[in-house]
Amino acid sequence: MKTSSNLINTDIMAKVTFAGSAVTTTGELPAVGALAPKFGGVRGDLSVLHLPDLLGKRVVINFFPSLDTPVCAASVRRFNKEAAALDNTVVLCVSKDLPFAQSRFCTTEGIENVIALSVFRCKCIDEKYGITIADGPLRGLLARAVVVVDTDGRIIYEQLVDEITNEPDYVAALAALK
């Protein structure tokens, strides 16, 4: 097992790019068919929502670096639009932005059909989802990824977006719900 100076196993790091430059993540996304790893995030009102709280509903998890980037903001707007037509489905938009910033963005943009969650204090994302960027200018933020979970808590779709500045494949993610 190779390790870097911060003791992350570099044998299992995923590779993506940011503006064409290679960066790595702290691991790999869990596989389709696996139980979705538990995590919790902070809402704009500072209450905590845990993934297991949503068992019985389908869940789309939109992970992204920061709402302060055009692509991330666009992904939240798009999932908000799509979520309005989804039955028994919750869409979580997850980043390390502070909950106050997420709340301000959602209010300003009229985002009402998704739940913004901040994982600014959740270290478990690193080990359970492997999507924290390990190097480069966005080190410490989340890579762009989408995970879709069925009503039993199993992953039915996952995508780690190869280029962080690209939007996720909305069509494929939403098709997993059909």
Functional labels for PLM-detected ranges:
Residues K2-K178:
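Chalcogenol-based redox active-site neighborhoods
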